Amino acid sequence: MKFELDTTQGRARRGRLIFERGTVETPAFMPVGTYGTVKGMTPEEVRETGADILLGNTFHLWLRPGEEIMRKHGDLHDFMNWQRPILTDSGGFQVFSLGDIRKITEEGVHFRSPINGEKIFLDPEKSMQIQDSLGSDVVMIFDECTPYPATEDEARKSMQMSLRWAQRSRDEFDRLENPNSLFGIIQGGVYEDLRDESLNGLVDIGFDGYAVGGLAVGEPKEDMHRILEHVCPKIPADKPRYLMGVGKPEDLVEGVRRGVDMFDCVMPTRNARNGHLFTSEGVIKIRNARHRDDTSPLDDKCDCYTCKNYSRAYLYHLDRCNEILGARLNTIHNLRYYQRLMEGLRGAIETGTLDAFVTEFYTSQGREVPEVPELSD
């Protein structure tokens, strides 16, 4: 992977990630394909929304279908027929989400399969091996996602163990002679000094990119912004910056303003299936009865297949009847909305008009533009 940085405005960055399988324009949003599919979508449909790269889930793909079946197909690209870049998470967050059915030790994590209750062990080495079998273009280190809330001492112990796991991930990645890219994950909770210690340790080990983990796990939005403002300028400028698991459209806007290059989140797809649709004027809840006879498109500024061909009334009808097509059309729209937002942010950075773009983004939804500190590198 090669990262090119074209231009900046304040801390916002416009660039690209260049892989053998294709180029990813940044800032970028990655749709989530947990089980090797973006729910309800063919790879061609996902690509048509503007996506350059997908996220796959190491934990779930390890449990089903497993490494053996994956290798029989070649890798995850061949299995799901997506011949563009794929980033896979390490499984750490999913293990964190298991709660009481997992036990974390220095060696790794013991847990019971959420599928059949089988006892399973996952450690940094195994995570690297699984991601190698997936053929991931971007591999994430195995870490512990520090919970929120956590005391400073708890966050420190968690972060320091993640650093030790980062070294083990690096060593196993190199032993496997994996030709792809490995990203480190900065932990430390809401504590700036711990974030510094984590980042410095990761830079000493050396990675192809750096993710900010352990955010969007319940902390106040102000804390997320504060940590991003503190950490992003300290990440090596020639490496991509990835904010994991974020988020709402405004979170993407605010992340870009603070120097983030990459995002992922299930929100556009999950919300689509629940009838929450993103538009240039805010969220539309298609299940609201006022859409029953509305012949207008979801968003007259949107160029997606759904908006070009169907009315709000039709989408309301499909939802009321629990038709699969409704969830699919909603997903196409929400994913295209996210990609259009990223296209707009990239264009605004290129032309030096990011402030105007941000103002229009908020005012078109009847919202105030949030104040941010003067951000410059």
Curated annotation (Swiss-Prot):
Q: Which domain of life is it from?
A: Bacteria
**Under the GO molecular function aspect, what terms does this record hold?**
metal ion binding; tRNA-guanosine(34) queuine transglycosylase activity
Positions of Zn(2+) binding: C302, C304, C307, H333
* Note accompanying the cofactor annotation: Binds 1 zinc ion per subunit.
Q: Which reaction does it catalyse?
A: 7-aminomethyl-7-carbaguanine + guanosine(34) in tRNA = 7-aminomethyl-7-carbaguanosine(34) in tRNA + guanine
List the pathway annotation.
tRNA modification; tRNA-queuosine biosynthesis
Transmembrane stretches in the record are none
Catalytic residue list: D89, D264
PANTHER family, A to Z = QUEUINE TRNA-RIBOSYLTRANSFERASE
Q: Which family does it belong to?
A: Belongs to the queuine tRNA-ribosyltransferase family.
Q: What does this protein do?
A: Catalyzes the base-exchange of a guanine (G) residue with the queuine precursor 7-aminomethyl-7-deazaguanine (PreQ1) at position 34 (anticodon wobble position) in tRNAs with GU(N) anticodons (tRNA-Asp, -Asn, -His and -Tyr). Catalysis occurs through a double-displacement mechanism. The nucleophile active site attacks the C1' of nucleotide 34 to detach the guanine base from the RNA, forming a covalent enzyme-RNA intermediate. The proton acceptor active site deprotonates the incoming PreQ1, allowing a nucleophilic attack on the C1' of the ribose to form the product.
Subunit annotation: Homodimer. Within each dimer, one monomer is responsible for RNA recognition and catalysis, while the other monomer binds to the replacement base PreQ1.
Q: Which protein is depicted?
A: Queuine tRNA-ribosyltransferase
Q: Which organism is it from?
A: Shewanella pealeana (strain ATCC 700345 / ANG-SQ1)
Q: Which gene encodes it?
A: tgt
